[in-house]
Design a protein with these regions (language model features):
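Short amphipathic alpha-helix that is part of the acyltransferase structural core
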Residues: 25, 39-77
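A conserved beta-strand-loop-helix scaffold within acyl/acetyltransferase catalytic domains
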Residues: 73-125
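Conserved active-site tyrosine of GNAT-family acetyltransferases
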Residues: 14, 166-167, 171
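Acyl-donor-binding surface of acyltransferase catalytic domains
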Residues: 1-49, 178-182
Length: 184
């Protein structure tokens, strides 16, 4: 469902006509020229490595379980894009427990507009609460910058706890969008 910018006359008119907000999304933006991989993440990497968790580029035949991890997320868009990207040699960052894929972000490449593309970021249900999401996201920002992207943008729900990771990496909310519904 498309969202309606909440700072527009259309949004106010729809409210007046009985439409209500089902959910609110925010668009967030980061100018990558300002991004620096922080020392606190290097420390986190060392701590996580001591517990067997790493982030690295996906390597076919070396790491295992990418298909199963993506399937466990129950997201049809990711199921259609991420396994083919991984098996097709695209640049995909993965969170690992040993050699088992525990999370992903990417594929990583700059779009012609200069925007750093990524389909999403997720950590599988059995691997959450170890810091992989934060580490994957910071590694993603650095990888996008390194491959020539000038900025990154994303949509996320206003109640999504991951927005705290995005904000800590320097992302700023630029606009809010309401997904509107109306009973007929």
């Amino acid at each position: 469902m498309p969202g309606i910018p909440t700072d527009t006359a259309l949004y106010r008119r729809m409210l007046a006509l009985g439409w209500v907000e089902a959910t609110t999304e925010q668009v967030m933006h980061l100018d990558l020229s300002d991004f620096q991989y922080p020392e606190k993440m290097r420390e986190k990497e060392r701590e996580m490595a001591e517990n067997g968790y790493f982030v690295d580029w996906y390597r076919e035949g070396v790491q295992q379980g990418v298909d199963e991890m993506v399937e466990s997320l129950n997201n049809s868009m990711w199921s259609e894009e991420i396994p083919p990207a991984a098996h097709g040699g695209m640049r995909l960052l993965v969170g690992l427990e040993g050699n088992t894929v525990a999370g992903f972000t990417g594929p990583v490449y700059p779009e012609p507009t200069g925007r750093g593309y990524f389909a999403g970021i997720a950590v599988g249900p059995g691997f959450q609460n170890h810091g992989l999401g934060s580490l994957l996201f910071y590694k993603l920002c650095q990888a996008e910058k390194d491959c020539g992207a000038r900025y990154m943008s994303l949509f996320t729900g206003i109640n999504n706890h991951a927005q705290n990771i995005y904000k800590s990496a320097g992302f700023e909310t630029k606009r809010y969008f309401a997904v509107m519904i109306k009973e007929l």
